Design a protein with these regions (language model features):
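C-terminal output/interaction extensions
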Residues: 119-129
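DNA major-groove recognition helices of helix-turn-helix
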Residues: 71, 118-119
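Conserved binding/recognition cores within well-folded domains
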Residues: 4-104, 108
Length: 129
């Protein structure tokens, strides 16, 4: 089976799986080469370090390439929040907000001063839903 044929079939299968669940499958260009898929129901947060994105999931961390802005635009419709320009968090996994940090899955993520008011407001809106 050719790679292109395989990828087309895999995309159809994944699209069918996506339609069944509430979440979304993110396509990640992995650091080791190739493509990985992460379901947003398992995604706790995304952080940018240099030119790499680190996806913190229930199953462990994964690294990939891309921009945080592109991921934020895709995840915004699923109520993910952005405490700073370098991170996106899934509010379902927020354990604590203390001072200028938010703890998600045991990872402390800084909340920028410029976004703190908006972040806390969005988090409050999400909690009250």
């Amino acid at each position: 089976m050719l790679y292109d044929t395989f990828m087309r079939k895999m995309d159809r299968i994944l699209a069918g799986l996506m339609a069944r669940g509430q979440g979304l499958l993110l396509t990640v260009q992995s650091v080791g080469g190739g493509t990985e898929y992460i379901h947003t129901d398992d995604l706790m947060s995304v952080e940018v370090f240099g030119h790499k994105l680190v996806y913190h999931t229930k199953g462990g961390d994964r690294e990939g390439y891309g921009t945080i802005a592109a991921q934020a635009a895709e995840l915004e419709k699923l109520s993910f929040l952005q405490p700073s320009r370098s991170a996106i968090v899934n509010p379902r996994f927020i354990e604590a907000v203390k001072g200028d940090t938010v703890r998600v899955g045991g990872v402390e993520i800084p909340i920028s001063r410029l976004r703190k008011k908006e972040f806390l407001s969005e988090l409050n809106r999400w909690i009250c839903k």
